[in-house]
C-alpha cells in the first residue's frame, strides 16, 4: 500500500472512531509503529488530526476557558487514577496546595477519608467544602475576588497571599503540556499567573495532566518543565513524551 493510500485510510478510521492508537494502526497496515507515528505527524501538520500519546484524535489544539464544574465529569476514570496516585504521595504533616481543577476535587474526595494530619491550602471553594468533616485536615482558603466560573479567587490578592506560604508539595492542574517546546499552559491569564506563583513557593511541584492535555496548548504559559519535579498522568506516556520530560529531569508517575 502506498503512503498516500494509507494516510487516507487512517483519516477514514479516525473520522469514524474519533480516536486511533499507533499500535492498532501498525498491526492493521503491517508497518512499524515508527512509520505510523510519521504518518500521524504528517496528517497533524496538514491540520487533519491532533496527536496524543499513543495515537491521535480529532480535536482542536487550544485549551479553552470553561466552567470547572463542567470538567468534573470529563475522563472521570483518568482523574480518579491521578487522584489516587496523589494521595499515596502525600505524607503526614505535609503542607500541600491544591489549585482550581476538577482533578483537585477528586483528590479532596479521597483525602477526606484518610487519617493523615495535613494542611491543605487551596483557592477552590469546593475543595474546602470536602474537608468540612475532616478534623485531621487543616484547611486554608485563599481569599480575593471570586471568579464564579472557575469556583475560586485568582486575582492579585490571591497571588499576594500565596507568596507568604512555605508549601511542601503543590499539585497543579495544566490546561496544556507542550512536549515540543517544554512549557505548561492554561486558558486564563490571572489563573496562569497564580499557578506560576505556586510553582515558585513550593518545595516540590507536581503537574496533574490526563491524556487529553498532551499536545494541547492554552493561551497563557505558566511554567517550564524545568520548574517541575513530577508529572502525574493517567496512562503510561509514549517514548517521545517520556524523553522530553526526562530531559528536563521531570519524573513521570502513572
Where are these regions (language model features)?
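Conserved phosphate- and dinucleotide-binding cores of soluble alpha/beta proteins
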Residues: 2, 12, 21-25, 30, ...
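HTH-adjacent hinge/linker in prokaryotic transcriptional regulators
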Residues: 2-5, 9-23, 28, 34-100, ...
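Generic beta-structure capping elements
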Residues: 59-61, 101, 142, 174-175
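Alpha-helix/helix-capping structural signal
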Residues: 102, 125-126, 236
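Glycine-rich SAM-binding Motif I of class I
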Residues: 105
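A residue-level structural signature of the nucleotidyltransferase/glycosyltransferase Rossmann-like core
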Residues: 119-120, 169
